[in-house]
């Protein structure tokens, strides 16, 4: 059995789909590291620290899950964490091509690092962080897609963003 796995992502914000995959990965592996990518090129709404806090809250009930922020190459982070498996989620066939290319690149850079793909529960298959942010930006209720504290934080973040735009 592989002991250590990494589930990497930006998690901006963490959704119920992410939480579902984390719970299932926690049953499959002895230790799961949620690797939150700093990834400034994506211009996340939440800071790395806020995303670490959110994931820590969402995974607090899972004893074998650890939340860690990182920057740089994922394969280097995996090596530093002594992880042998990357867990990735596939929501739809459209995700497969990108994930397949990413898995092959990671394998080329680190041949001992395996990629494992999990699909979300049907009720979470359409949820993405991008869609959740879009719904929230237009005043929609996102509470059915994210943890209640994450929904509140997103609402506050968008209100602050709109207030800052109004002051300029």
Curated annotation (Swiss-Prot):
Substrate binds at residues 10, 42, 74, 88. One of its GO terms (cellular component) is cytoplasm. Disulfide bonds: none annotated. One of its GO terms (molecular function) is ATP binding. One of its GO terms (biological process) is coenzyme A biosynthetic process. Its EC number is 2.7.7.3. Homohexamer. This is Phosphopantetheine adenylyltransferase. It comes from Shewanella denitrificans (strain OS217 / ATCC BAA-1090 / DSM 15013).
């Amino acid at each position: 059995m592989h002991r250590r796995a990494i589930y990497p992502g930006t998690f901006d914000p963490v959704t119920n789909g992410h939480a579902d995959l984390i719970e299932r990965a926690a049953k499959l592996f002895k230790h799961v590291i949620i690797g939150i990518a700093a990834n400034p090129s994506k211009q996340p709404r939440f800071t790395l620290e806020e995303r670490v806090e959110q994931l820590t809250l969402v995974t607090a009930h899972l004893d074998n899950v650890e939340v860690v922020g990182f920057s740089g190459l994922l394969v280097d982070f995996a090596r530093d964490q002594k992880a042998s498996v990357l867990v990735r989620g596939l929501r739809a066939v459209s995700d497969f091509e990108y994930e397949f290319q990413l898995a092959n690149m990671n394998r080329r850079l680190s041949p001992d690092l395996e990629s494992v793909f999990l699909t979300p529960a049907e009720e979470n298959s359409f949820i993405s962080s991008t869609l959740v942010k879009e719904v929230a930006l237009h005043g929609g209720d996102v509470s059915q897609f994210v943890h209640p504290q994450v929904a509140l934080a997103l609402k506050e973040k968008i209100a602050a963003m709109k207030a800052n735009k109004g002051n300029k």
